[in-house]
Amino acid sequence: MTEAQEPEYGGPSVPQTRTARHRRIVDILNRQPVRSQSQLAKLLADDGLSVTQATLSRDLDELGAVKIRNTGGELIYAVPSEGGFRTPQAPLGGSAKEERMRRLSAELLISAEASANLVVLRTPPGAAQFLASAIDQAELHDILGTIAGDDTLMLISRDPSGGQALADHLLRLAQNDR
């Protein structure tokens, strides 16, 4: 059994598994430009994941990572996006991610109900996971996590009584009121 290690940034512990390592690699590549495998290895080590260059090379290959030119002209690693977009793209800025969440909320959100720190969102059939992905990628600090089914999402607020404020915020986004 592998032990979880506590990362330096004080976040949740990360298990030493292939799946956890792949998730961290994707998170890092989506969060910031990474120019080399050695830079990526250092960022993973900062999160408590020690990897060899051979393992990292294999992981990048399994994830479909390629080097692309970002808007600044630098060659950086990128992975294919979730949601069917197989062409790797440079990470979106925070405002682009929030705009995507706003647009998808306006298109897909049918209702939002809150109870304590929970929010239940309803969408058309088949759309819940798409909206959940946009909410996750927006990395809103108030949201601890999302769970999505076919037409229902559950959001968990960090604030024990923050569900109603979160539901109201998402409903305002859906109505294009900022």
From Swiss-Prot:
Gene3D superfamilies: 3.30.1360.40, Winged helix-like DNA-binding domain superfamily/Winged helix DNA-binding domain. Belongs to the ArgR family. The gene is argR. It comes from the Bacteria. Signal peptide: none annotated. Keywords: Amino-acid biosynthesis, Arginine biosynthesis, Cytoplasm, DNA-binding, Repressor, Transcription, Transcription regulation. GO terms for cellular component: cytoplasm. InterPro entries: Arg_repress (IPR001669), Arg_repress_C (IPR020899), Arg_repress_C_sf (IPR036251), Arg_repress_DNA-bd (IPR020900), WH-like_DNA-bd_sf (IPR036388), WH_DNA-bd_sf (IPR036390). GO terms for molecular function: arginine binding; DNA binding; DNA-binding transcription factor activity. It is found in: Cytoplasm. One of its GO terms (biological process) is protein complex oligomerization. Regulates arginine biosynthesis genes. HAMAP family: Arg_repressor. Pathway: Amino-acid biosynthesis; L-arginine biosynthesis [regulation]. Pfam families: Arg_repressor (PF01316), Arg_repressor_C (PF02863). Residues 1-20 are annotated as: Disordered. This is Arginine repressor.
